[in-house]
């Protein structure tokens, strides 16, 4: 198939080996100008150190580094948290939530520089190619999309390193890379290496942020979270931005080994993959939000929020962020979160984050009605009529079966 003709491409650039190869490869194979776009989603200063110089030395004409940290947490993480989304019951969607904010910013840079194409470094095996290209389709259907991993014949790190060496392009990457990692403000994921066999227990070097829970402090630590409309607005009495609150809780949780999971998940493309994910601050925040929900949501609202969480987890994981259904699901969750206001104390100890105290001005919990002692506000005799009506369909079914 003949290649499309493009003049200027904006590539999502990380500074790693793959994207360092993509820049000269695009120039050689498409005879185009390449602009590097770097998204700062909280992956850390070390990851961003010297990234602009790397991009330019690889052949990029320009390099844009865009700070997306606050937008990522405020506009992508919290709306997802309000749904209660856990993919397949465990995964807090750290990589999945980051892709749409990155793709959106990449499109904005493309518009700014007058590019006619977008490129990414996602492999043909993973979920991210779908997430990026799904976002591009929704936000910039007029732009061409180039996925080098689906076109080139470079199939190993050695081949990529040789490619750069032949062109005298400097690269600090090593020949051996044990793990594949992805980090942002919300989490860090580790895949590959020893984890490729499900019979291998994770090595300690599979974990990056968190201490081994067995080696965590022997004394519990408590953090107090103030929640307003389903979002953390203060921690330990200090008002914080969404990103700063997450950063603070990441540090607290990591110290106590909170937020580790080792899972095998179903990828969108059909295969299963295994990963070790660390989400210390996010685990604390989710525990706090669910604790307040227990106080303020009535039974049917809580059931509906759980249904929203399951649907949202698949929409986000599957790269359907910029769709009407995702917007509708999140709008419903946002409506339920209006009364999710309160204060929660979370105990951090040996890998666990547990809500030990909670209160809310919107609480539906009444000590007068909930007491197990003598009370004067609840007439127990009223329960009989309710139960008879509640079980009426079962009674009718049984009587009908007895007649047959």
Swiss-Prot record:
<keyword id="KW-0436">Ligase</keyword>
<comment type="subunit">
    <text>Homotetramer.</text>
</comment>
<feature type="binding site">
    <location>
        <position position="91"/>
    </location>
    <ligand>
        <name>L-citrulline</name>
    </ligand>
</feature>
<protein>
    <recommendedName>
        <fullName>Argininosuccinate synthase</fullName>
        <ecNumber>6.3.4.5</ecNumber>
    </recommendedName>
</protein>
<dbReference type="GO" id="GO:0006526">
    <property type="term" value="P:L-arginine biosynthetic process"/>
</dbReference>
<feature type="binding site">
    <location>
        <position position="131"/>
    </location>
    <ligand>
        <name>L-citrulline</name>
    </ligand>
</feature>
<dbReference type="InterPro" id="IPR014729">
    <property type="entry name" value="Rossmann-like_a/b/a_fold"/>
</dbReference>
<dbReference type="GO" id="GO:0004055">
    <property type="term" value="F:argininosuccinate synthase activity"/>
</dbReference>
<feature type="binding site">
    <location>
        <position position="39"/>
    </location>
    <ligand>
        <name>ATP</name>
    </ligand>
</feature>
<dbReference type="Pfam" id="PF00764">
    <property type="entry name" value="Arginosuc_synth"/>
</dbReference>
<dbReference type="GO" id="GO:0005524">
    <property type="term" value="F:ATP binding"/>
</dbReference>
<dbReference type="GO" id="GO:0000053">
    <property type="term" value="P:argininosuccinate metabolic process"/>
</dbReference>
<feature type="binding site">
    <location>
        <position position="123"/>
    </location>
    <ligand>
        <name>L-aspartate</name>
    </ligand>
</feature>
<dbReference type="GO" id="GO:0005737">
    <property type="term" value="C:cytoplasm"/>
</dbReference>
<dbReference type="Pfam" id="PF20979">
    <property type="entry name" value="Arginosuc_syn_C"/>
</dbReference>
<dbReference type="GO" id="GO:0000050">
    <property type="term" value="P:urea cycle"/>
</dbReference>
<feature type="binding site">
    <location>
        <position position="189"/>
    </location>
    <ligand>
        <name>L-citrulline</name>
    </ligand>
</feature>
<keyword id="KW-0547">Nucleotide-binding</keyword>
<comment type="similarity">
    <text>Belongs to the argininosuccinate synthase family. Type 1 subfamily.</text>
</comment>
<dbReference type="InterPro" id="IPR001518">
    <property type="entry name" value="Arginosuc_synth"/>
</dbReference>
<feature type="binding site">
    <location>
        <position position="277"/>
    </location>
    <ligand>
        <name>L-citrulline</name>
    </ligand>
</feature>
<keyword id="KW-0055">Arginine biosynthesis</keyword>
<feature type="binding site">
    <location>
        <position position="96"/>
    </location>
    <ligand>
        <name>L-citrulline</name>
    </ligand>
</feature>
<dbReference type="InterPro" id="IPR023434">
    <property type="entry name" value="Arginosuc_synth_type_1_subfam"/>
</dbReference>
<dbReference type="InterPro" id="IPR024074">
    <property type="entry name" value="AS_cat/multimer_dom_body"/>
</dbReference>
<feature type="binding site">
    <location>
        <position position="127"/>
    </location>
    <ligand>
        <name>L-aspartate</name>
    </ligand>
</feature>
<dbReference type="InterPro" id="IPR048268">
    <property type="entry name" value="Arginosuc_syn_C"/>
</dbReference>
<feature type="binding site">
    <location>
        <position position="265"/>
    </location>
    <ligand>
        <name>L-citrulline</name>
    </ligand>
</feature>
<dbReference type="InterPro" id="IPR018223">
    <property type="entry name" value="Arginosuc_synth_CS"/>
</dbReference>
<feature type="binding site">
    <location>
        <position position="128"/>
    </location>
    <ligand>
        <name>L-aspartate</name>
    </ligand>
</feature>
<feature type="binding site">
    <location>
        <position position="121"/>
    </location>
    <ligand>
        <name>ATP</name>
    </ligand>
</feature>
<keyword id="KW-0963">Cytoplasm</keyword>
<feature type="binding site">
    <location>
        <position position="180"/>
    </location>
    <ligand>
        <name>L-citrulline</name>
    </ligand>
</feature>
<comment type="pathway">
    <text>Amino-acid biosynthesis; L-arginine biosynthesis; L-arginine from L-ornithine and carbamoyl phosphate: step 2/3.</text>
</comment>
<keyword id="KW-0067">ATP-binding</keyword>
<dbReference type="InterPro" id="IPR048267">
    <property type="entry name" value="Arginosuc_syn_N"/>
</dbReference>
<feature type="binding site">
    <location>
        <position position="127"/>
    </location>
    <ligand>
        <name>L-citrulline</name>
    </ligand>
</feature>
<feature type="binding site">
    <location>
        <begin position="12"/>
        <end position="20"/>
    </location>
    <ligand>
        <name>ATP</name>
    </ligand>
</feature>
<keyword id="KW-0028">Amino-acid biosynthesis</keyword>
């Amino acid at each position: 198939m003949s290649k499309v003709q493009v003049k200027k491409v904006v590539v999502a650039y990380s500074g790693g080996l793959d994207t360092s190869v993509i820049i000269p490869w695009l120039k050689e194979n498409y005879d185009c100008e390449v602009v590097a776009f770097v998204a700062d989603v909280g992956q850390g200063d070390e990851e961003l150190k010297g990234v602009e110089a790397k991009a330019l030395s690889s052949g990029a004409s320009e390099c844009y580094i865009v700070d997306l940290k606050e937008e990522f947490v405020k506009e992508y993480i919290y709306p997802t948290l309000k749904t209660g989304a856990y993919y397949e019951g465990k995964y807090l969607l750290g990589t999945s939530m980051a892709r749409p904010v990155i793709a959106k910013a990449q499109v904005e840079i493309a518009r700014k520089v007058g590019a006619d194409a977008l490129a990414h470094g996602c492999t043909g095996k993973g979920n991210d190619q779908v997430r990026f290209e799904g976002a591009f389709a929704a936000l910039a259907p007029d732009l061409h999309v180039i996925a080098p991993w689906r076109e080139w014949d470079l199939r190993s790190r050695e081949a990529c390193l040789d490619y750069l060496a032949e062109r005298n392009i400097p690269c600090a990457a090593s020949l051996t890379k044990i793990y594949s990692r992805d980090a942002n403000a919300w989490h860090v994921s580790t895949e590959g290496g020893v984890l490729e066999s499900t019979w291998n227990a994770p090595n300690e070097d599979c974990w990056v942020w968190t201490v081994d829970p067995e080696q965590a402090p022997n004394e519990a630590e408590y953090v107090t979270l103030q929640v307003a409309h389903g979002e953390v607005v203060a921690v330990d009495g200090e008002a914080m931005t969404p990103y700063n609150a997450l950063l603070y809780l990441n540090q607290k949780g990591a110290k106590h080994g909170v937020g580790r999971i080792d899972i095998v998940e179903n990828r969108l493309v059909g295969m299963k993959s295994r990963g070790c994910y660390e989400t210390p601050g996010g685990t604390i925040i989710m525990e706090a939000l669910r604790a307040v929900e227990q106080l303020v949501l009535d039974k049917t609202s809580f059931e509906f929020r759980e249904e929203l969480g399951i649907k949202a987890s698949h929409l986000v994981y599957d790269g359907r962020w910029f769709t009407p259904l995702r917007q509708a699901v999140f709008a419903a969750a946002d409506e339920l979160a209006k009364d999710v206001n309160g204060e929660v104390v979370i105990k951090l100890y040996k890998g666990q984050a547990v809500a030990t105290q909670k209160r809310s001005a919107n609480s539906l919990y009444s000590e007068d009605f909930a007491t197990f002692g003598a009370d004067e506000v609840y007439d127990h005799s009223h329960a009989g009529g309710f139960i008879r009506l509640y079980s009426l369909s079962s009674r009718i079914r049984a009587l009908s079966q007895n007649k047959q």
